[in-house]
């Protein structure tokens, strides 16, 4: 009997195709059903150039993807902290020490800040590597497809070096105008305070680190106002490139004025 943890070890560290099939059947009831869910999930992640036909990565004329799509998948995988120990393990064992697992991705033991993800090889796709690393609060992901056995590591290392040397994380700062309360009509208070629903660091070029916030707000809102109500949005730009957008929400309620008051 193998646990889910053992199966994940086998797949992530040892590239075990049989374990991938077992996990697929356990999650979806059958491999075909799992493949359908894989494709639906891939589409949700924005992997619009990807079609999966099996969970193992076997060569198939109908199966295809791109380096950009795989980078999107890795970006999502990086959010699952429970997977990090598997991605970061170079060598492990199953069934006591009966089965040895050795990670084909040598970055798992050699690259500073390594967080994942996968080294693989098939006849049609060649030697591939999807790698991610975090340094100084910034995560970079690089993907090389159809490379050679050794050159894929050199290429990915060069891509990551470029990412860490040319970009940095910047925290958005808001002007006094942003913090100015919004007018409320018909309420017990004449204004309401608001904030951005989701504010986090953004990656910008070190050479051009300018970051601007563009607000979309009405001139006023009508009472009553609930706490957490969406009243607009703010978009963060680096030059002409929008990095991300989030809602503006109220931080307090405002009751409507009544005749009794």
Task: Label the model's feature ranges.
Residues 1-68, 72-81:
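Active-site-adjacent loops and short helices of periplasmic peptidoglycan-processing enzymes
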Residues 47-51, 59-261:
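Domain-terminus/edge residues, biased toward the C-terminal soluble/receptor-binding domains
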């Amino acid at each position: 009997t193998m646990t889910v943890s053992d199966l994940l070890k086998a797949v992530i560290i040892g590239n075990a195709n049989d374990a991938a099939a077992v996990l697929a059947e356990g999650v979806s009831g059958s491999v075909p059903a799992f493949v359908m869910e894989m494709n639906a999930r891939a589409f949700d992640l924005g992997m619009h150039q990807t079609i999966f036909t099996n969970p193992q990565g076997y060569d198939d004329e109908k199966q295809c993807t791109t380096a950009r799509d795989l980078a999107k998948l890795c970006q999502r995988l990086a959010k699952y902290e429970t997977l990090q120990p598997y991605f970061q393990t170079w060598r492990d064992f199953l069934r006591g020490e009966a089965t040895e697992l050795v990670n084909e991705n040598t970055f798992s033991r050699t690259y500073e800040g390594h967080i994942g993800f996968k080294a693989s090889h098939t006849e049609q796709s060649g030697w591939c590597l999807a790698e991610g690393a975090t340094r100084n609060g910034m995560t970079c992901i690089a993907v090389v497809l159809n490379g050679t056995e050794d050159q894929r590591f050199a290429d990915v290392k060069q891509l990551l070096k470029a990412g860490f040397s040319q970009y940095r994380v910047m925290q958005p700062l808001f002007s006094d105008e942003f913090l100015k309360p919004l007018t409320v009509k018909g309420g017990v208070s004449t204004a309401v305070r608001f904030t951005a629903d989701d504010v986090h660091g953004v990656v910008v070029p070190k050479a051009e680190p300018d970051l601007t916030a563009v607000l979309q707000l009405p001139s006023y809102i009508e009472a009553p106002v609930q706490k957490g109500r969406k009243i607009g949005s703010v978009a963060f730009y680096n030059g002409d490139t929008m990095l991300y957008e989030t809602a503006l929400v109220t931080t307090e309620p405002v009751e409507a004025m009544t005749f009794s008051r």
